[in-house]
Amino acid sequence: MTEDKVTGTLVLAVFTAVLSSFQFGYDIGVINAPQQVIITHYRHVLGVSLDDRIAINNYALNSTEELPTSLGDPTPVSWAEEETMTSASLITMFWSLSVSSFAVGGMIASFFGGLLGDKLGRIKALLVANILSLVGALLMGFSKLGPSHILIISGRGISGLYCGLISGLIPMYIGEIAPTTLRGAIGALHQLAIVTGILISQIVGLDFILGNHELWHILLGLSAVPAILQCLLLFFCPESPRYLYIKLDEEAKAKKSLKRLRGSDDITKDITEMRKEREEASNEKKVSIIQLFTNASYRQPILVALMLHAAQQFSGINGIFYYSTSIFQTAGISQPVYATIGVGAVNTVFTAVSVFLVEKAGRRSLFLIGMSGMFVCAIFMSVGLVLLSKFPWMNYVSMTAIFLFVSFFEIGPGPIPWFMVAEFFSQGPRPAALAIAAFSNWTGNFIIALCFQYIADFCGPYVFFLLLVWSWPLFCSHFLKFQKPKENPLRKSQQSSERRGVQLKRQKLL
């Protein structure tokens, strides 16, 4: 059967597409390694360097002169303390904005990825989106020459807009060009490219490579390289045959695209499947985001999709490096950054493993195994951290639990939500479904980025256990009752919901 064939054109198209996913991961991880270097630069630009703050304290403690004030007569020490606290708060504010502006941009743009893909086509939409990527990279790359805090915040926000667009575009495109039997494995490559980008950003962010006072701006602007490469390669990639056939009704172009992707003239099965989907789509009105929740045919699939993304984000995976650093320091590792890179490497390896497992073990099974494993690891992490002061050897228990936590995440909860949404819906509601799912993911990302430190301060070592206790029932209540057939992953799930919707209507009429 030709549908199982992996052709050079398919490899080129998927590789080119997931360069966007790589940029996504790179932009997530690149800001972490040079944190202290960038904060030091912020102090210099804003005139509140560490040396200045020390000088203020020394002056306040040793001088007998009155310091100017408009708020009565505080002592020199209180004036200096207030000045120091204000300076520290200013730096913290700009650093927090530098990190979180990326997620804000992603939240805003996530609604428009599918819509842009429908308006311009998948290839042209990616070309247009790369304009944002290049602008963001250039702002960050030249941030050392101007007001760095403003340029980095702006660049991160614009890069977030780009990543928000592609978080809907890439799963849609690679899901539409992939052969049916390889759709899950190819869909998982989106997540693999993301974690690879995170790992590469951690490596090149080492202080002896680019994460130092001289080269940190180049580190931030380096995402322009995959953006330029993708722009060049996109001219050689075929447009989505599903988009051409179903959306534009251009059968000849769709067949040409399919023949390139399949490497054969025998495309009867693909055309038959798309023809059936087009007939069904022609009977469907344009589906809005609101209709996904009000229409019984779409309600359960979209709720499942949202819960999958919520469970992914609120599992605590994005906060894992907060505790890993302290644990590795406690274990006596002089350079905990290398241990963190080790976690990133495990992250990448097990994502690659999931690519091969997803078609054999099934989506639901892998998600269940992953969530169950993370739940157990969270317990061991919490126990290890609670007992660390009494039993120093418990740090090794926590270290092992962190590595296993990441491994279980990438077996299922990491990659599966991204491509499952494209499989749940037909061509009509798919763009709206991808938009709302991407928005859900970005919203969870932003909430964790903004609140994790406060939750960790309040809950201490129980933070991961608490997050998983919250996300587990969300997953169970929606995903366990959703039986997803294997034979037609693009339509069977929705048809099942449509039948239930018809049955509900009949019951109401009776």
UniProtKB/Swiss-Prot annotation:
Glycans are attached at residue 62. Keywords: Cell membrane, Glycoprotein, Membrane, Sugar transport, Transmembrane, Transmembrane helix, Transport. It is found in: Cell membrane. Residues 490-510 are annotated as: Disordered. The keyword Protein biosynthesis does not apply. PROSITE patterns: MFS, SUGAR_TRANSPORT_1, SUGAR_TRANSPORT_2. N-glycosylated; required for stability and retention at the cell surface of pancreatic beta cells. Residues 1-10, 118-122, 179-191, 237-301, 358-365, 422-431, 476-510 are cytoplasmic. The chain crosses the membrane at residues 11-31, 97-117, 123-143, 158-178, 192-212, 216-236, 302-322, 337-357, 366-386, 401-421, 432-452, 455-475. D-glucose binds at residues 191, 312-313, 318, 347, 410, 418. It catalyses: D-glucose(out) = D-glucose(in); D-fructose(out) = D-fructose(in); L-dehydroascorbate(out) = L-dehydroascorbate(in); D-galactose(in) = D-galactose(out). D-glucose and maltose competitively inhibit fructose transport. D-glucose, D-fructose and maltose inhibit deoxyglucose transport. CDD domains: MFS_GLUT_Class1. Residues 32-96, 144-157, 213-215, 323-336, 387-400, 453-454 are extracellular. GO terms for biological process: D-glucose import; D-glucose transmembrane transport; dehydroascorbic acid transport; fructose transmembrane transport; galactose transmembrane transport. It is a multi-pass membrane protein. GO terms for cellular component: brush border; plasma membrane. GO terms for molecular function: D-glucose transmembrane transporter activity; dehydroascorbic acid transmembrane transporter activity; fructose transmembrane transporter activity; galactose transmembrane transporter activity. The keyword tRNA processing does not apply. Facilitative hexose transporter that mediates the transport of glucose, fructose and galactose. Likely mediates the bidirectional transfer of glucose across the plasma membrane of hepatocytes and is responsible for uptake of glucose by the beta cells; may comprise part of the glucose-sensing mechanism of the beta cell. May also participate with the Na(+)/glucose cotransporter in the transcellular transport of glucose in the small intestine and kidney. Also able to mediate the transport of dehydroascorbate. NCBIfam families: SP. Belongs to the major facilitator superfamily. Sugar transporter (TC 2.A.1.1) family. Glucose transporter subfamily. This is Solute carrier family 2, facilitated glucose transporter member 2.
